[in-house]
Amino acid sequence: MSVERTFLAIKPDGVQRGLVGEILGRFERKGFKLVGLKQLIPSKELAEKHYGVHKERPFFTGLVGFITSGPVVAMVWEGDGVILSARKLIGATKPLEAEPGTIRGDLGINIGRNVIHGSDGPETASFEIDLWFNSSELNNWNPSDQKWRVE
């Protein structure tokens, strides 16, 4: 595997329920490196760009309304195979179908309140990182335990 970056966002339901620390901890314990982090209430314009692939879907308006309804914690994580690993840690989109031990399986309520968003592939990750972060907001650093993280 190669070192890559992914975009994750703790949605307003996760922030309001006080799950930020729990979720951050899962990715830290997995050994991934946090290179970008900010909390914001997304603008309608940002939300519409982020969910643009769903523009023609009947749930688009509700999705945009929800993600702009409160604070979101936007993050960029880095590591070997981080995109696929993050998807596995997050679990299925529908919490009732997500495996126990995953974020959505343990913490999600329903498809509309599933706590977290994660990029689904390299192209999406690149698009979402560029949409939510300026390059100056991303930090290149090496953890002191780096030699224990990668071969």
Curated annotation (Swiss-Prot):
UniProt keyword annotations, A-Z: ATP-binding, Cytoplasm, Kinase, Magnesium, Metal-binding, Nucleotide metabolism, Nucleotide-binding, Phosphoprotein, Transferase
Catalytic activity of the protein: a 2'-deoxyribonucleoside 5'-diphosphate + ATP = a 2'-deoxyribonucleoside 5'-triphosphate + ADP; a ribonucleoside 5'-diphosphate + ATP = a ribonucleoside 5'-triphosphate + ADP
SUPFAM superfamilies, per database record: Nucleoside diphosphate kinase, NDK (SSF54919)
Pfam family, one: NDK
One GO biological process term: CTP biosynthetic process
Residue positions of the active site: H117
GO molecular function: ATP binding; metal ion binding; nucleoside diphosphate kinase activity
The keyword DNA damage is annotated on this UniProt entry: no
GO cellular component: cytoplasm
Subcellular location, principal: cytoplasm
Positions annotated to bind ATP: K11, F59, R87, T93, R104, N114
Biological role stated in the UniProt entry: Major role in the synthesis of nucleoside triphosphates other than ATP. The ATP gamma phosphate is transferred to the NDP beta phosphate via a ping-pong mechanism, using a phosphorylated active-site intermediate.
Quaternary structure and partners: Homotetramer.
Name this polypeptide is given: Nucleoside diphosphate kinase
Organism: Prochlorococcus marinus (strain SARG / CCMP1375 / SS120)
Lineage of source species: Bacteria, Bacillati, Cyanobacteriota, Cyanophyceae, Synechococcales
Gene (name only): ndk
